[in-house]
Amino acid sequence: MLMAGKKLTAQSGSYRIFRWLPLLVLLLATATTAQTPPKARLPESSIKTVYVIPTSHYDFGFVEPPDQVRERAARHIDEVLRMAESDPDFRWTIESVWQVNEWLKRQKPASSVLPKDNAKIARLMSLIKSGRIALSTAWGSMHTDFMGAEELNRLCYDYTVLKRTYGVESQLALMDDVPGHPTSIPSVLANSGTKYLVTGLNLFLSSATDLAPGKVPFYWQSPDGSKVLIWISQGKRGGYVEGMTDFYLDPYSLDPYTNKTPYEMFNPNAGPKTDLQKMEEGITELLNRYNGGGYKYDSVMVMYAHDFVEPTNVKNLEKAVALWNNNHPEIQLKIATPPEFFHVIESKYQAQIPTYKGEFSGLWSEAKTQSPLISGLARFAHEQTPAAESLWSALSMTRSIPFPVGNMSSLYDWMFTYDEHSGAGNTGWIQLNDRGLLEEQNRQYVRYMKDARAEVENLFSRGLSLAAQPTRYDQPFKQASANEFNLLVYNGLSWSRTDVVQVKSPHDGQKIVGISDAATKQSLAFDTDANGQTFFLAKDVPSFGYKTFTVTTATGQSVSTLTALPRSTEASNTNYRVRLRPDGNVQSIYDVRSNREIINDKGELPFNELLRVEGANAARVPVPNSPVITVRKGKLLTEISVERAQAAFSSTVVRIYDGLERAEISNSIDGSRLPFPGGSGNWSDNYYFSFPFSVSKDNLKIMRGGQKWFDTLPDDYLSGARKDSVTTQHLIGLTDGNATAMLAHRQAFHFAYAGFVNTKLLPKGAPQEFPAMYTGKFPLPEATVYSHAFRHTEQADTHDLGVVNMATVEPGLGDRYLFDYAIRAGGKWDAVKAWHFGAEFNLPLRAAYVDVPPSQPTRSFFDINQPNVQIVSIKPLSDTVVHGEVSATPLDPQLNKRYTIRLQEFTGRATEVRINLPVRIKSATRMNLTEDVELEKLASISPLTVRLEPFATATILIEIEPGK
């Protein structure tokens, strides 16, 4: 034997040492083993493989203003690309499409004017195509129950753009943090080509569903029959962070907020532990959690994520996985993407996977009550944007004018940004935010929504003007009198309607003295209020169309036509009789035609009372002076006003109109007079308007008006879902099977149920009660809903300065809040009547003065023949709207020839619907929701006829014959 170039002999000292070397090695190994703790015995379980899913959770806002987060996300994708190219075992899931969008915007070489760095882009897309990087099809982690109906339909549109442009494919949606979603989500995802949904649900406030962890994955089905295979990771520490904070799969990486490992954070007194011991504790927790739920499959998915973490953490995860797999062959860890896990589960267990239906919105959209003015602007954009889009589609078809796709793209991007789960003007998280960044975040949210409102108003202003604009072939128009003005009234809904129009005199110093129908010349009754606002009833304004009226003026200031009724607190017309209490709250709204009282004067609180809740404790809003109640009556309008001098709840106006089946309530809040919040261990106060209805509590159902249909609650809740409150689109209904009350709402959107809100003032010194939201239950004690108007906070506990007083979280919007409601009663629940009522209140008739009246005084651009179907939007086909090419030769305007019509059946009744269009069409095809897959060629195109199944959303592609 040779050692160091020398021959060893039996006589050499080196040989004697070498002869004892095996024994020394054995002794050292024995000593080391004695110091190493034995491997833990894990609980018995069906689970043999844990699929670990690395990703990073991004919030718009939260730690930085949205625009800075966009920059951060772009840098993050660069790091994902670098890590993937340097490590062949690297796996990653990109949480949101918006992150890729932001990265793509910045992929431009310094020497380039327009062309992008296509080689670099191709590298990322190649990794996505290979499956090593998974891409969510969802734009972001959204407050899905707050989103507008058409906005929600476009949740996966930007993914489809990536698919069409770069050839990437994904069947996975990932939405984290938000603890639940409404019943419309499976429909939207499945009809966009998405098969799988992963949700990391944050339960730090309340529950999501008790189907996790035992019953996951399951097929989650919408009322229309669409379904997705959903995996739910949920937990009090965040859900999506479970791999790091619950199961300790990575004992090396640091928590992004504390600079400690999660194990150190949650086990400060644990004492010295080896890395393997920490992991064993975590895996034991994982197995116990799933065993306790009755989990039966051999594989499980664990999300490995945290806020804004970088993909470099995967190196630590790989180290930890290798350590574990070398020591515990009985349960193996596998770094993967969600599709890998889903494919395994479906291949083995598809026949055993259950299907569940139900609503389980976590109701985090309540956070948007912190900025009620911004949220009101967002809801305005939700309704008005599809209406403006449909108007401009009609103009594009009939006027041969390019469709303004860029305006619509901006509008939807602003809405998506605010409707993402961090979107709200707020005072930040305790000790997290720097003051300057927090204030800039709030300014940006205000800017987005103010820009959205301005964009919408410009689209309608120019669009309605264009609708009336004569062509060069029309005869010149001469106004009969300089005191006559042409008023075009537009209906942005897909059914003819009679509704109130509000308009002011076209010029200062002139008053309206007459209004007539331009076609029939019939004079119309109207009223003018003390603010110079004129009201009249426009009858039978056609679907997606207009009627023209002639307004006659005279010199002079506007004077109210309403007559005050002295010392009265009661008013009536042919439909309603309204009576107020001396304190200004509503005592009675009586439906004359149905001989039915609508409100319950014996409820927990009076109708329309403003309730303040300090922390979890009920309080009253001070009213220093007795309210002044005035009743005014005119030819059309009857109103009761309540003025509360020097009070935060400054005024209420109740309006009823002859010929209109609704009573309206407008509540004004003077934010400058709100009490300073705090003093009860709380940072904020919550304000609710109380609406007790005269509907029996027996067999009481809450009808939740969503984006696509009504959910019946509590029947339609997913098992274990949060049941204390609900977010609705246009209307919330209450029915006992015989009597119904309907409450439509504009700015407010979140409602709590009776029994889930503290309404009783406790005596001073009384022991604190457990918050009502945790003790309320179904069946409800009465038919009352509390409209959560706003959350009021004035102090922020900042990271850099400590506690600061903030003058506002909505800079530039002022401190006057307006909350509009409309009330209507009925017998048995009528989904068509309720849907139309809510939609009409949220999209009022729009009036515009035009210089020249349109050649047709009344016109409908689009209409349908079924009342249970709505045209949600009409727009150019998505793959024809953005070209991104530059020509050296100036081009003529490129006209749109292909459009899509979005239809929604909202009652659950199969139907055949006929659609009338302003142009002839060459062909029609039924498409999927994202407009990239043909489903069916339609044979009946003259007129266009479509068969709809119950609750179906249909996207119909038409190719028009321009000019015909």
PLM feature spans:
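Catalytic grooves of carbohydrate-active enzymes
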Residues: V52-V63, Q68, S226-Q475, Q479, ...
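Bacterial N-terminal signal peptides
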Residues: R19-A29
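C-terminal (or distal) subdomains of carbohydrate-active enzymes
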Residues: I185-A190, G200-F204, G214-V216, Y248-D255, ...
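N-terminal catalytic cores of secreted or lumenal carbohydrate-active enzymes
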Residues: T36-F146, L162-R164, Y219, P223, ...
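The substrate-binding groove and active-site-proximal loops of carbohydrate-active enzymes
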Residues: S56-R72, E95-S96, W103-V113, T137-L152, ...
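Surface-exposed loop and adjacent secondary-structure segments within mature catalytic domains
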Residues: A122-S136, E150, P182-N259
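CE4/NodB-like, metal-dependent polysaccharide N-deacetylase domain
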Residues: L152-P179, T183-N191, E285-M301, L944
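N-terminal secretory signal peptides that target proteins for export/translocation
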Residues: M1-I17
